[in-house]
Amino acid sequence: MAKNDNELYKGLDDLERNKGESNYLRGTIVEGLNDPITGAIAEDDTKLLKFHGSYMQDDRDLRQERRKQKLEPLYAFMIRVRIPGGKVSTDQWLKLDALADNYAGEQIRLTTRQTMQYHGILKRNLKKSMQSIHDAVLDSIAACGDVTRNVMCNPNPYQSDIYAEVNRAADSISEHLLPKTTAYHEIWLDGEKVVDTKKEDHEPMYGKTYLPRKFKIGIAVPPSNDIDVYSQDIGLIGIVENDELIGYNVSVGGGMGMKHDDLRTYPQVGKVIGFIPKDKAEEVCEKILTIQRDYGDRSDRMQARFKYTVDRKGLDWIKQELNDRLGWELEEAKSFEFEDNGDRLGWTEGSGKHHYTLFIQNGRIKDTEDFKLKTAIKELAKVHKGDFRMTPNQNLIIANVDEKDKPEIQKIIDNYGLTDGKNYSGLRRNSMACVAFPTCGLAMAESERYLPSLVGKIEDLLDEFGLSEEEITIRMTGCPNGCARPALAEISFIGKAPGKYNFYLGGSFKGDRLNKLYKENIGEKEILESLRPILEQYSKEREKGEHFGDFVVRKGIVEKVTDGRDFRG
């Protein structure tokens, strides 16, 4: 490496060097894939692989036993598909379902960003899996990494025309902000190789080192905030007048991740800075992204998210810098009102079509002896003439069903015992968990495998106090990275150690306020003992229509938090 290149990365996080020297995300990934000695790839390449939509993981349930046997960890890979707005055709679903059968343990995991991911893919099957995604006319480019992640939008089963428009916007923003490197096609799809500097790849928007950290964009359409718009780096809030989408309020600087022992880190809610016409969304997102590219902290990844750039520079500075880059000014924000951040479960109707939102607990699609969920959805895909939409709450919408086809869809739903969640408590319907153990390397505690059981024990308390039908959001993550957006929930648990969680209360049912630490590093017994008197008090003293999160704030059980800088104080 030349001396001036050494100077280029001096004082920066080492990942900046890795990205900059990677030849636009190639690194030595191909060599690693072809190495038969290990199930892993090189450490630097694992960082680059994220930009291709994949993480290297290992089965943590087996780590100790394999160590005893003097074996390397059971390495496998997760692939996350890029699906802006979460919409797939039934033909695409069938191909993605087959991928799970062939390479991923016959399971699909719906994510909190309206896409799907596969776990347990062995290195020898990684390229074949990527090609299977390509066969479904999809890809996994930028599903992970320091780039714009999967662009979300409100599925709006009851406002189909508006949904179609915001889904097109999500598609267009995603395509516009996609990395331009040809590395993905070269490595996974046997595209033409860039072999010398005379034909060097390029990244006109991102540059060689891409963004300082991941960058998330989502479009919400009031009254539903199901995408948790305030958790996004850029949130676009659709403004509808006379049944027509006229534009978006723009929110900046949201983000959920933090680190337990780094008090400089915190979750944050985005702040609205103005209104834009709908045809300006792509341009505005690009300019905001370039502000983060130029001013985000590349020396400390714990301070590299856009939320810290916004808080460090100030909202007024961000708005002025955006106006300067655009060459025109944002308008004053328009009024809007959110009602909730959940899904419309069961049958809904809009624009002459019917839509059924299927409740899928924590997004896990697999067959068990008693519940053939994966098979059921495959059977639906074989006969359904509309499309499927993955929701931000890890559920699945069977969308665009004609009146004449409703009985056939309902018959499959009934035959397989599928549910709209209405047979469950309001708490379970609004529950969400990240994957955590055994595949996530960051997990400090269980999440997906534990939350259903904990919810069952909390349901006993809800039954006791007559609260079973109350809609209450509850979320759990195995670490503080925030994949299930726990800091926005009315009740949340963030893993601290095996069996131990930080317990938070006071988020908003609308998703527009952060919760607050109530008790630290506690287990199940203390969780239930702590919740009992609060739920009892809520049952007796709540005002009409008052949500649980609002109640605990009004009663002073926790402080109201509307800015992440007050989250820890």
Swiss-Prot record:
Pathway: Sulfur metabolism; hydrogen sulfide biosynthesis; hydrogen sulfide from sulfite (NADPH route): step 1/1. Gene3D superfamilies: Sulfite Reductase Hemoprotein, domain 1. Its EC number is 1.8.1.2. It catalyses: hydrogen sulfide + 3 NADP(+) + 3 H2O = sulfite + 3 NADPH + 4 H(+). The gene is cysI. Binds 1 siroheme per subunit. Binds 1 [4Fe-4S] cluster per subunit. Transmembrane segments: none annotated. The keyword Amino-acid biosynthesis applies. InterPro entries: CysI (IPR011786), NiRdtase/SiRdtase_haem-b_fer (IPR005117), Nit/Sulf_reduc_fer-like_dom_sf (IPR036136), NO2/SO3_Rdtase_4Fe4S_dom (IPR006067), NO2/SO3_Rdtase_4Fe4S_prot (IPR045169), NO2/SO3_Rdtase_4Fe4S_sf (IPR045854), NO2/SO3_Rdtase_FeS/sirohaem_BS (IPR006066). This is Sulfite reductase [NADPH] hemoprotein beta-component. Keywords: 4Fe-4S, Amino-acid biosynthesis, Cysteine biosynthesis, Heme, Iron, Iron-sulfur, Metal-binding, NADP, Oxidoreductase. Component of the sulfite reductase complex that catalyzes the 6-electron reduction of sulfite to sulfide. This is one of several activities required for the biosynthesis of L-cysteine from sulfate. Alpha(8)-beta(8). The alpha component is a flavoprotein, the beta component is a hemoprotein. Siroheme binds at C483. PANTHER family: SULFITE REDUCTASE [NADPH] SUBUNIT BETA (PTHR11493:SF47), SULFITE REDUCTASE [NADPH] SUBUNIT BETA-RELATED (PTHR11493). It is an enzyme of class 1 (oxidoreductase). Belongs to the nitrite and sulfite reductase 4Fe-4S domain family. One of its GO terms (biological process) is hydrogen sulfide biosynthetic process. GO terms for cellular component: sulfite reductase complex (NADPH). Its cofactor is siroheme; [4Fe-4S] cluster. [4Fe-4S] cluster binds at C434, C440, C479, C483.
